[in-house]
Amino acid sequence: VGSEMCIRDSKVEDLTKAQLVSIYTGETKNWSEVGGDDQAIVVIGREAGSGTRGAFEELLDIADACVYANELDSTGAVMAKVASTPGAIGYVSLDVVDDSVKALKLDGVDATEENIKAGNYALSRPFVMATKGEISEQKTEVQALFDYLSSDEGKALIKSVGLITVD
């Protein structure tokens, strides 16, 4: 699953990983420092304990170092806050990005399915399903779920909600 960096309105199209770290740790405070307008950066993120936040901070190696203006309890809330707040930046799952915000490139790379699968986009992580023991040792219903999600129909469903399948 990819995490997309989104902003409200700025000349900035692309950030480096180092710039993103600097923004989220509070070192960079104004968009003019990264090629944008002279406007304060408003850092939006998920609440402590969120899996999305944990993955984002882990991927950037900044766990417990972020300085947030707002910590919100859902991806939808992050999107809405970024869309309504001048100078805002936030991270959301790739499957929820819409036209209310502007998506940013990271190190010149768009968060596309192709780039994520190729390992070229830095803010991505796999979601995995796990069982205690082999799938063949599980209840029939569990085996059926794994079989379905691995089928063409299951993969189509996963893609239909904006997620990326493992081929």
Locations of regions flagged by a protein language model:
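Exported/periplasmic ABC-transporter solute-binding proteins
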Residues: S3, R8-D167
